[in-house]
Amino acid sequence: MAARLCCQLDPARDVLCLRPVGAESCGRPLSWSPGALPPPSPPSVPADDGSHLSLRGLPACAFSSAGPCALRFTSARRMETTVNAPQSLPTTLHKRTLGLSPRSTTWIEEYIKDCVFKDWEESGEELRLKVFVLGGCRHKLVCSPAPCNFFTSA
């Protein structure tokens, strides 16, 4: 079973953050609307420990209250800077967390929607997800089962 993470835009830093949703949560957050400030992380989710989630091979920063730095690094590498990211990308990711059907217009939106979120939600374990999330992050992994060669696993 895949752990649930919600994607939120941090307008103060112009970055996208993944935040763990507690096991006791019954659904995806619906209170945030595009253009509004994202809701704070659920208080029932520990900010420093990912052992309650079923994901493995994620960097330790994935469970921080600020969200994983890996996503910020990967976004910066693929889109030059996170500030220059397409304005529709946060909307697309937000729609995906709500289970809506976003109309993506760029290759990076399609990549995230189809290769990352879909495989993550449906199978819970996807090599391309690991490559995307771990790329560029220097934090230690959480419960990593074995070393992985990210250059040959995609």
Swiss-Prot record:
Protein modification: A fraction may be phosphorylated in insect cells and HepG2 cells, a human hepatoblastoma cell line. Phosphorylated in vitro by host protein kinase C or mitogen-activated protein kinase. N-acetylated in insect cells.
Subcellular location: Host cytoplasm; Host nucleus; Host mitochondrion
InterPro entries named in the record: Transactivation_prot_X (IPR000236)
Any one annotated GO CC term: host cell mitochondrion
Signal sequence segment: none
Region: Mitochondrial targeting sequence, residue numbers: 68-117
Alphabetical UniProt keywords: Activation of host NF-kappa-B by virus, Activator, Apoptosis, Host cytoplasm, Host G2/M cell cycle arrest by virus, Host mitochondrion, Host nucleus, Host-virus interaction, Modulation of host cell cycle by virus, Transcription, Transcription regulation
Pfam families given in the database record: X
One record GO biological process: symbiont-mediated arrest of host cell cycle during G2/M transition
Record function comment: Multifunctional protein that plays a role in silencing host antiviral defenses and promoting viral transcription. Does not seem to be essential for HBV infection. May be directly involved in development of cirrhosis and liver cancer (hepatocellular carcinoma). Most of cytosolic activities involve modulation of cytosolic calcium. The effect on apoptosis is controversial depending on the cell types in which the studies have been conducted. May induce apoptosis by localizing in mitochondria and causing loss of mitochondrial membrane potential.
Annotated family: Belongs to the orthohepadnavirus protein X family.
Subunit structure: May form homodimer. May interact with host CEBPA, CFLAR, CREB1, DDB1, E4F1, HBXIP, HSPD1/HSP60, NFKBIA, POLR2E and SMAD4. Interacts with host SMC5-SMC6 complex and induces its degradation. Interacts with host TRPC4AP; leading to prevent ubiquitination of TRPC4AP. Interacts with host PLSCR1; this interaction promotes ubiquitination and degradation of HBx and impairs HBx-mediated cell proliferation.
Name of the protein in question: Protein X
Protein source organism: Hepatitis B virus genotype H subtype adw4 (isolate Nicaragua/2928Nic/1997)
